[in-house]
């Protein structure tokens, strides 16, 4: 029954946006503002996805973002799989991104620590979670699209880069985590 309520509410929002033309207008505005820059389009859609995903459950976030934002990414030339994974990923990142950070606040409550500090710590430790969607949007071989050699090369180099970046951000080699 919970899923029916979520899907019904998302359907009402999406239906309203489609009837008023705002869904199509958002796609056009995103493409117009970004111009020919895929990176600017990805940054704008990431911010919008995090904002729209705050406080919403997974299914509702995906339905909303797949209707509003994914068409702009597909129109810009990003593969449909990468576009939908990008919006889904950033919609879910709203759960650990302050100020809402529902998952971080729940973990802080269990651990008995300050929710705000837990949210910022989750953002700092999980920095690579904000980078990975850009990687697979720009290089779909991370989503197993393409030849086996390109997939292996991309996964290997991305893994090494994320490991090195995480060690640098967290400071694991110089201090204990």
Where are these regions (language model features)?
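Hydrophobic transmembrane alpha-helices that form the pore/transport pathway of multi-pass ion
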Residues: 58-93, 100-117
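Hydrophobic residues within the alpha-helical transmembrane core of Major Facilitator Superfamily
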Residues: 13, 47, 93, 131-134, ...
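Membrane-interface helix termini and inter-helical loops of multi-pass transporters
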Residues: 17-33, 140-150
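Alpha-helical transmembrane segments of multi-pass membrane proteins
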Residues: 38-52, 77-93, 117-128
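Transmembrane helix-loop boundary segments of multi-pass membrane transporters
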Residues: 86-89, 115-129, 136-160
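Core transmembrane alpha-helical segments of multi-pass membrane transporters/permeases
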Residues: 1-22, 38, 42-51, 55, ...
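C-terminal accessory/binding modules appended to enzymatic or scaffolding proteins
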Residues: 161-177
């Amino acid at each position: 029954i919970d899923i029916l309520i979520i899907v019904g509410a998302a359907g009402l929002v999406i239906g309203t946006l489609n009837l008023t033309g705002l869904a199509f207008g958002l796609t056009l505005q995103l493409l117009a503002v970004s111009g020919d820059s895929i990176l600017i389009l990805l940054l704008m859609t990431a911010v919008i996805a995090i904002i729209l995903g705050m406080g919403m459950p997974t299914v509702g976030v995906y339905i909303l973002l797949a209707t509003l934002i994914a068409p702009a990414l597909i129109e810009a030339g990003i593969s449909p799989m990468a576009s939908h994974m990008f919006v889904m990923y950033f919609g879910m990142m709203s759960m650990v991104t302050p100020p809402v950070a529902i998952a971080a606040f729940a973990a802080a409550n269990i651990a008995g620590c300050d929710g705000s500090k837990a949210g910022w710590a989750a953002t700092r430790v999980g920095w690579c979670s904000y980078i990975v969607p850009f990687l697979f949007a720009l290089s779909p071989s991370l989503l197993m699209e393409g030849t086996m050699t390109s997939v292996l090369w991309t996964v290997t180099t991305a893994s090494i880069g994320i490991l090195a970046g995480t060690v640098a951000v967290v400071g694991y080699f110089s201090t204990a985590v």
